Amino acid sequence: MHTVTSKDGTKIAYDKVGQGPSLILVAGAFSYRKFPGQVQLAHLLSEYFTVYNYDRRGRGDSGDSPSYTIEREMEDLQAMIDEAGGSAYVWGLSSGAVLALQTAAAGANIKKLALHEPPLVVDDAGHKPPEDFVKRVSVLISANRRGEAIKYFMTKGMGAPSFVVSLMRVMPGVWSRLMAVAHTLPYDAALLDGYMDGKALPEKLWDAVTMLTLVIEGTESPVSLRHGAHALAGNLPNARLLSKKGLGHTKKLDTKKISSELAAFFMGNR
């Protein structure tokens, strides 16, 4: 394990594996650097890249601050980019894709950007979280009701059936990993605030994101995720959409398929 110090003094933990161009992995909600899917993906990509797999603040071995702002998480990613040599390829998953996107828009030196199913809700098709979603997640965590927060985030935020959460509760290894990072769910909710209301993305919203960008979706994914991916690819000035079966993230990451597509994108001319 390595650490880097973010702008506000918070220690950010990361693992570094492989040799080659620098690639930073930005996890989504419920995930962290030791999450099995993250570990597998980092291992597969290490054949081609120096992979930096880090714990977002508040997770795993990373520190945290008394109060959260999106800007602090953006500074964490910038610290990782600096640690990786000042520029890097970046892959972000779900809320991590939104974090990577916001950091890119703020001027980070990202050579190429892969945005994997950012949960943007751009119309009324499919699932849409309730209007008080962000507030309710924070209330549950403030009351230390982690189990309820997990269920609420998954069912109301992600649209998962209640029985799926019930099954996870009786899987000790799975549930313990979720409980360990549940207190950071308000961070993910804050990142998504304003992007899950069913409204079209404003034109030129992310015009500053000029690097080559790959927006990834699985054809098996929920319609709201797919529509969001299509809208984002059309909104960014230098992006293309990759749509294939097996690239979804709502069940289990197919790390072999994903790593293959990421290697082709980051190492290719387009």
Predicted regions and their residues:
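Conserved HGGG/HGGXW glycine-rich cap/lid loop of the alpha/beta-hydrolase fold
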Residues: 3-63
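Conserved catalytic-core motifs of eukaryotic protein kinase domains, centered on the activation segment
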Residues: 35-37, 62-67, 125, 226-227
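Active-site loop/oxyanion-hole signature of alpha/beta-hydrolase fold enzymes
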Residues: 43, 52-89, 260
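Short beta-to-alpha linker loops that shape the active-site pocket of alpha/beta-hydrolase fold enzymes
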Residues: 55-59, 119, 245-248
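Conserved hydrolase catalytic core segment
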Residues: 87-124
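Helix-rich cap/lid subdomain of alpha/beta-hydrolase
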Residues: 118, 122-175, 188-189
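Conserved serine/cysteine hydrolase catalytic core
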Residues: 177-234, 243
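Catalytic active-site module of serine/aspartate enzymes centered on a nucleophile-bearing elbow/loop
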Residues: 238-270
